[in-house]
Design a protein with these regions (language model features):
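Sec/Tat signal peptide C-region and signal peptidase I cleavage site
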Residues: 15-19
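Periplasmic-binding protein-like
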Residues: 100-103, 182-187, 193-194, 225-249, ...
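A ligand-binding cleft/hinge motif common to bilobed small-molecule-binding domains
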Residues: 79-83, 205, 210-228, 277
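Mature extracytoplasmic/periplasmic domains
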Residues: 243, 248-303
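Extracytoplasmic ligand-binding site segments that recognize negatively charged/polar headgroups
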Residues: 29-33, 68-208
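Early extracytoplasmic/lumenal segment of secretory-pathway proteins
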Residues: 20-83
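An extracytoplasmic/periplasmic, membrane-proximal ligand-sensing/linker region
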Residues: 176-178, 279-328
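Short beta-strand->loop
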Residues: 90-99, 112-113, 141, 211, ...
Length: 328
């Protein structure tokens, strides 16, 4: 039903007459409504958007066969952006603002850029763990311990770019054999895989699960102020990936799309985006917000972004072969 609804929404977008000064966006980013409102205020360009995870966007792009129903892809896991580039589904655009973005956070050929950094961490429900006599897991090894059987929730990496980034990071850090052995143990604690990256933290908030693997953005960290939950980075190693953005090949509103990329990478745009969903940003000189917990940069896994993207199909095929029965 949800897929049908998404298709209907996109169909409605396609049938609508979009004049100059409009922009159609698929987005997987916290605070997007206010971000787009500020962009519209600054540029006069009206934004129509729909929320969709990165894996869903990639599948839809391929099905549209060069006739995209949107102009810009904003947010989501970088693996899908790299796959889309390799399949010829993205428009090359080197924004002048990219001079202030380190090369490790953007495509050297100009097909995508990072917006912010997504780090992967844990969220625990303190009351649930206390009731069950459990300590909060401190490391990835802890998370796979038998004591957390059926207590861990995480998103399906085939759909959630954040969770695919976690899988790819750990494979790159541990090596294939050790990583897949680890995932076998971890998945014994995971009764099912959620469809979206934002679903696991909410299931911990409501007490359905004691522990979640989450993207460590302000959107979820701020839940600590309202609920008995704690968010934190693993003590052993921190998976990470840039949240991407790109223009679709054959975008109808290309000029508006380019203006959005310029704005989102500008000092003004990066500040607005950071303030609406606090994260570490990609542009040089943009301060990390206080709400984002202190990051031990030495704990970030040393990853190859190209490997993360180019190995996506191989990694997900192996994941689905082993754990596909857990997909929700």
């Amino acid at each position: 039903m949800k897929k049908i609804l998404l298709a209907m929404l996109f169909g409605a977008m396609t049938l609508t007459s979009f004049a100059e000064g409009k922009l159609k966006v698929v987005a997987a980013y916290g605070g997007k409504e206010k971000i787009f409102q500020q962009f519209s205020k600054d540029t006069g360009i009206e934004v129509d958007f729909i929320d969709m995870s990165s894996g869903e966007v990639l599948s839809k792009l391929q099905a549209e066969k060069g006739k995209p129903s949107a102009d810009v892809w904003f947010g989501g896991g970088l693996d899908s952006f790299i796959s889309a580039k390799n399949k010829g589904l993205l428009e090359k655009y080197i924004s002048p603002e990219m001079e202030e973005v380190p090369l490790k956070y953007r495509d050297k050929d100009g097909y995508w850029s990072g917006v912010s950094l997504v780090l992967v961490g844990f969220m625990v429900n303190n009351e649930i763990l206390e009731d069950r006599g459990l300590e909060a897991p401190k490391t990835w090894a802890d998370l796979a311990k038998e004591e957390y059987r059926d207590e861990v929730i995480m998103a399906n990496p085939a759909i959630s770019g954040t969770n695919y980034a976690m899988v790819s990071n750990l494979i790159q850090e541990m090596g294939d054999e050790k990583a897949w052995a680890y995932f076998e143990e971890l998945n014994k604690n995971v009764p099912f895989l959620a469809k979206r990256g934002g679903e696991p933290p909410m299931k911990v908030v409501t007490g359905e699960f004691g522990v979640a693997v989450i993207p460590m953005s302000g959107e979820f960290i701020l839940l600590e102020e309202k609920y008995p939950v704690t968010t934190y980075y693993p003590e052993d190693m921190i998976p990470w990936v840039p949240a991407g953005m790109a223009i679709f090949k054959n975008a109808e509103n290309l000029d508006s799309a380019k203006k959005f990329i310029d704005w989102a990478l500008s000092e003004k745009g990066q500040t607005v985006i950071r303030d609406e969903d606090p994260r570490a940003m990609v542009r040089n000189g943009i301060a990390t917000p206080d709400v984002v917990k202190k990051i031990d940069m030495d704990k970030l896994i040393n990853i190859d972004i190209d490997v993360l993207g180019n190995d996506r199909e191989k990694v997900l095929n192996e994941w689905n072969k082993r754990f596909g029965n857990k997909a929700k």
